[in-house]
């Protein structure tokens, strides 16, 4: 074993390890250099990210512009490309550009959504707010109702067809009474087989009612009454006379608004909209009562035809064939016929003697059961 003395001597002969001492100024300079390097790295990243975002924004911008241009061009092409109805009949009402613009809006889809919501049950605590707000907005006369408490109406559909007190709607002894609460849009004699729904705008009887048998008698003329039901009106419709309905015709179509302010801008609107036509007879010959659907009013119920389904999804609605059902439904004045699920229009077309005298004028408010004629029927 090596003596301890030799070990210590060997250790003393080894070269000493040098320890470099860094002065404070050098440390500060190093920190600054590292900081600058970090800043450069972050700056480079920001430049890269900024360029990427700018490129993305530019791509989104050009995509949006391209979509608008292509969509606009397609829409203009749709408006000016002849429709199959125009090809068959160059004078078809669909050739009118205003109708084509209006028809391009998604009224049917919106009406199906609104119809579904109207049938949804409303929580009891919310009924006063929703139904009460609707009643105040559209001036619904709740004092006419059998039940004026909003909490007792589970849905908007139930509220729209609330029962009224019999004392508030006495049925006139007149041979022709109003079928609904509403406003008179137009009335009078049908000239040249055309129904005028607002002044200056008309449509053919056969295009609206379909093929009907109108007995030609010199002592009888054809008349019409058009009644508009506003959203705040009572939405059920009743028999306007003692008559018998022997045919229920469902005509699928669109659900365009029938507000009086729009009727004068869209020709033949009633012929475009979905409708249910009840054809029959009364003591003077032909009698017809039609319920016309509208925006948010696609649901029409006819009590005599429970299988009837309106406001449903169809492919190529305009091309769907009409459905006709033979029925036998005798009615008396004031008897309930059916209901809307909001407001819309009732059109009466009937034969009567030329001595008929109407007791109404355009713009008059009506209540169902109120007399429409003063004499001559």
From Swiss-Prot:
Organelle targeting peptide span: 1-34
Active-site residues, Swiss-Prot/TrEMBL: 181, 238, 344
Keyword Metal-binding in record: no
Cofactor(s) demanded: pyruvate
Mitochondrial intermembrane side: 81-377
Pfam short name (any one): PS_Dcarbxylase
Pathway the protein takes part in: Phospholipid metabolism; phosphatidylethanolamine biosynthesis; phosphatidylethanolamine from CDP-diacylglycerol: step 2/2
Keyword Transit peptide: yes
GO cellular component: lipid droplet; mitochondrial inner membrane; mitochondrion
Modifications made to the protein after synthesis: Is synthesized initially as an inactive proenzyme. Formation of the active enzyme involves a self-maturation process in which the active site pyruvoyl group is generated from an internal serine residue via an autocatalytic post-translational modification. Two non-identical subunits are generated from the proenzyme in this reaction, and the pyruvate is formed at the N-terminus of the alpha chain, which is derived from the carboxyl end of the proenzyme.
Details of cofactor binding: Binds 1 pyruvoyl group covalently per subunit.
Superkingdom: Eukaryota
Spans within the Mitochondrial matrix topological domain: 35-61
Transmembrane regions listed in the UniProt entry: 62-80
Keywords: Decarboxylase, Lipid biosynthesis, Lipid metabolism, Lyase, Membrane, Mitochondrion, Mitochondrion inner membrane, Phospholipid biosynthesis, Phospholipid metabolism, Pyruvate, Transit peptide, Transmembrane, Transmembrane helix, Zymogen
Site note Cleavage (non-hydrolytic), residues: 343-344
Example GO biological process: protein autoprocessing
Positions where Pyruvic acid (Ser) occurs in the chain: 344
Reactions accelerated catalytically: a 1,2-diacyl-sn-glycero-3-phospho-L-serine + H(+) = a 1,2-diacyl-sn-glycero-3-phosphoethanolamine + CO2
GO molecular function: phosphatidylserine decarboxylase activity
EC numbers for this chain: 4.1.1.65
NCBIfam families to which the protein is assigned, alphabetical: PS_decarb (TIGR00163)
Family to which this protein belongs: Belongs to the phosphatidylserine decarboxylase family. PSD-B subfamily. Eukaryotic type I sub-subfamily.
Function: Catalyzes the formation of phosphatidylethanolamine (PtdEtn) from phosphatidylserine (PtdSer). Plays a central role in phospholipid metabolism and in the interorganelle trafficking of phosphatidylserine.
Subunit structure: Heterodimer of a large membrane-associated beta subunit and a small pyruvoyl-containing alpha subunit.
Protein name, UniProt field: Phosphatidylserine decarboxylase proenzyme, mitochondrial
């Amino acid at each position: 074993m090596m003596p301890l003395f030799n070990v210590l001597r060997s250790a003393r002969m080894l070269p000493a390890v040098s320890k470099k001492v860094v002065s404070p100024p050098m440390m500060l300079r190093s920190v600054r250099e590292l900081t600058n390097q970090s800043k450069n790295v972050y700056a480079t990243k920001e430049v890269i990210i900024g360029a990427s975002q700018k490129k993305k924004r530019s791509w989104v911008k050009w995509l949006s512009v391209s979509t608008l241009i292509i969509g606009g061009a397609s829409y203009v092409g749709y408006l000016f490309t002849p429709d199959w109805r125009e090809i068959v009949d160059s004078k078809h009402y669909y050739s009118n550009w205003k109708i084509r613009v209006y028809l391009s809006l998604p009224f049917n889809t919106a009406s199906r959504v609104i119809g579904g919501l109207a049938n949804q049950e409303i929580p009891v605590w919310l009924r006063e707010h929703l139904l009460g707000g609707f009643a105040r907005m559209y001036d619904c006369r709740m004092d006419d109702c059998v039940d004026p408490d909003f909490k007792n109406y589970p849905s908007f559909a139930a509220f729209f067809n609330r029962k009224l007190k019999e004392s508030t709607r006495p049925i006139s002894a007149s041979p022709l009474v109003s079928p609904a609460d509403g406003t008179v849009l137009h009335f009078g004699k049908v000239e040249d087989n055309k129904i005028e729904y607002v002044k200056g705008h008309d449509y053919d009887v056969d295009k609206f009612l379909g093929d009907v048998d109108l007995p030609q008698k010199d002592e009888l003329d054809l008349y019409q009454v058009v009644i508009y039901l506003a959203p705040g009106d009572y939405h059920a419709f009743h028999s306007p006379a003692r008559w018998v309905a022997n045919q229920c015709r469902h005509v699928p179509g669109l659900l365009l608004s029938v507000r009086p302010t729009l009727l004068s801008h869209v020709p033949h609107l009633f012929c475009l909209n979905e409708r249910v036509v009840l054809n029959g007879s009364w003591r003077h010959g032909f009698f017809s009562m039609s319920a016309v659907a509208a925006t948010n009013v696609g649901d029409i119920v006819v009590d005599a035809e429970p299988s009837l389904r309106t406001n449903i999804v169809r492919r190529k609605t305009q091309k769907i064939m009409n459905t006709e059902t033979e029925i036998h439904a005798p009615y008396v004045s004031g008897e309930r016929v059916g209901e809307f699920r909001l407001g819309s229009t009732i059109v009466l077309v009937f034969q009567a003697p030329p001595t008929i005298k109407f007791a109404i004028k355009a713009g008059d408010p009506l209540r169902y059961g109120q007399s429409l004629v003063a004499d001559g029927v």
